[in-house]
Every structure is written in structure tokens, then in C-alpha cells.
């Protein structure tokens, strides 16, 4: 199985085992953060692709309240200089306030809690002294909770860049989705994960994991006055410095069709660098995100089909149909192999109820029925080179090439939709990342067909439907062109734009680009830009020849560290 979206809320409430002992529900945000990493690591050991937490702030918010409850009672004991005071009633009252209101840290619930605390403090203080100690107690508890939440988010980032999985081969390929939670607790989580990302790793390095996806939603975070607009601005600022978060757009029509207000499990999420699993033709009552994932995908080398068509579009389509049908057969074979497995073959994914409906199965049961909620995807690579081989231009160069490109991808989507209707399984179309295949396919084709200008004359085929990176085009035009393809690729797609200069100094421009992606129908997008780091003073930003902070020249001692998301992408598998 490729990748999965983990429901931490359900997992934490039940408690879970990694095979070496049972872990009960966490009682603080720090322990919840630690267990989230353990869940990702354990699930990764059963799979080869990405692990995603689709509702990060929703899942962890209850544990912010648990930490707050502890901190408040501890501060009261310190203020009263009485470690033995019984505060169980206060603990229960805060739990009830959270249950009734969905928040304990909002202004109106803080007022309710302050009334309770004031009565407790009245046993020792009165008048102005009572008011001063009440103010201190309430503010100090919030301060301690915020500090612990920051440390918890910092730990998530550090752990997911250091803890090993899959027999120690590599760190888990993790991603977290957030952006729409509006309670004080949810906002505290999002703010602090962004601040921890901004701070970087131990020596200031840019963290690669988890891949972070900020969910953009009109009325929630896209304009002044929206409850989370400040967090969207912060996300833009952090992404301008650290490359993450990326941005997913919940109002894209093909995402919005599943959205139910008040149900975050219906908000589209991303696994890894682009994978998307949402629609569910096997069981339309389970068109939700948590507990589902991609079973397998296979990528088609479109440029080879175009080369062999020798300019004949009809021959290309004939070859494409044969190839897609071959992939269908291969994916069905793959499905049968997976379906024949038992729960014990996936001790965490299935044994601990991560995968949807797997909690109904026994240890020796086969997993055939539950995996039908997953997806089987047909991927593709090199649309740009395909168009050059067929008509002499790619889709960034002419409108006619763009129309042909859209027709090709639309045709592939129609084939996957028909296969879904035929089999009852969730077949989908995937704009494959193909970090390895992009070089492998073109090298094989060079040996067979030689150097063909615009097709095999580079060391790679262009990613999925992207306009080639070497082609001189404005960011707006690239977004506008690629945005037309996103709705066709229901298994996932991403669009990048490459920006020059130090975006830290122009967050307004960064924001405009993100929102233009939204306006052009992009479902998932990212802005790529140079990120340099001075190894001497730790400055992060654009460094030409001289570090603007310490004045060190490149080449003096240790070389300046350079990172771009094009380099980061080569690790993507989800």
C-alpha cells in the first residue's frame, strides 16, 4: 500500500500499540505531539509511501486544553503556596466547559474559568490583591500553555527529521494539513508549528519534514477580517523563508463538491507532495479523508508514445488507450495481491484500526473489502515533450498545443472514470511526481530514439502536465495554463512557480501569487525560490557572494548551503 491519511483523534482516544506495549491517550500537548510522530513512524513501517495527518490542528487541540488545565492548577498552587489543595472540581469544570463550548481558551470561556479561579483564590486574597493574583494566574497559565505548545510543535519537526523508519532506511515521509481550525486551541497549534518551522532545526537548517500544507478557504483565511487571515499571512511569511508550507485550495470546484461545513473530515488534504484521495465510488457514504489512501499507482511514459506515433495524433491515442488498459490490468493485479493479505501483514495500519473500517477485522482476516475504499491511480509524465513530439510546440508555446494537451489528459481521465464504473473500484488520474522516472525514462528513450530536439535533448522529462522549467514564462501565465489541468487529475496534482529574489522582503507579492493560484483553479500549489544559509552566522535568505549579516564571502571556509524545493522534491514518494 502506498500512502495513508491518519485520524489521530480516533487513534488517541482508543489508545494504541506499536507491538511492544499499549500507549494510552495522551494527557498533554507535548505527549500528544510525541505520539503523533510515533503513529506516523509506525504506520510508515507498514507502507512505502507518505503518511499524512489531514486534520492536524483539530486532532491536537484537545491536548492543548489538557495542558492548560494542568498549568492553571499548578499556577494556583504556586500562588496559594499550597501543593495539597484539592483542585479536582476545577479540573472537571474546565473539561465540561471545553465539552460544552469546543474551546476553553476563548475570551468568553476564559471569563467563565476566571470566575471559578477567583473563588479559589478568595481563600487567601481579597481586594486589589485578589484581582492582581487572578490576573497573574490566568495570564501565566496561558503563557505556559503557549510555551509548551511551541515546544511540542518544535519536537514534531525535529522528530520527523530524525527518527528512522522502515528498518532504519530513512525518516518517515510525513505531511501535515492545517489552516481552517478557528478555536483558540487550534490557532495556537497552527501559529506555533509555523513559528517552529520558521526557527528551523537545531543549527537553523530548513526542515524538510513534515511537508506542510496550509488549507486556503474563503471566509476563513484569505482576506482581512477572516478569523485565520493572520495565520495565512504568517504561512506566506514562513514559506517565503523555509519553502513550506505549500497551499491547498478548498474552494476549487473539484474539492468544494465534497466539503460539508463544520466537518473537517470533508476538507481535502494532501499526502506527501501531491497525492489526493477523496471521492469514493465503492462506498459513497465514506467520501471522507481520514483512514483512506492510495493503494498503488503506475506511470505512463507519454513522450515515448508520441515519438512512436511519428506525428500522427490518431496513432498516439490508439497507443495511449492500449497503454492505459495495460495499466488497468497491472493495477488490478496489484489490488489482488494486496487484497489477499491479512490484518497481521499490516500490524499497525490494519491491526490498530488506522485504515478505514479495519477495526471491524480480526487478526487473521483478509483485507480485501476495506482496501476498496482506497484508490488505484494511473500516472503520467512528460506532457510537454509529448506535445513537442506531436505538434512541434508544448502547451506553454501555443493555444492549439494547450488544447491538445487538455484533450489528452481529459481522455485519460475519462478512461479512469469508465474503469471506476466498470469495476466499482476507485480508479483515478495522477500527475506523477516522477523524480526518478523523469531521468530514467528519457535516458532509456535516448538510447532507442536518439536525441530529438525538445523531446529527449535534456536529462529529464518534464513533471506531469507542467510547463517546462526552462521555458521563459511569467508566473501568472504558468499558473493560468497549469490550473486548467488540476480538475482532471483527481488523484492529485501540484503546480510550482519559480520566483527570483528574497521573498521575505515582499510577503504581499507572495500572497498575491498564492491567491492567484486559487483564482485559476489550482488545487494544490507551491512557490519555489532560492533559500541560502550562511553556516557561520546562520542567516537564512538570498546570499549572493557576501552574507548580508556577517559579511562572510562565499568560499571562505565552509560553503554556503543552498536549498530549493526542486531539490527537496527528489525525496517525494507519496
Residue ranges and their predicted role:
Residues 1-373, 393-394, 398-573:
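Conserved catalytic cores of very large enzyme subunits
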Residues 376-389, 410:
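Contiguous, well-ordered alpha-helical segments that form the cores/surfaces of helical PPI scaffolds
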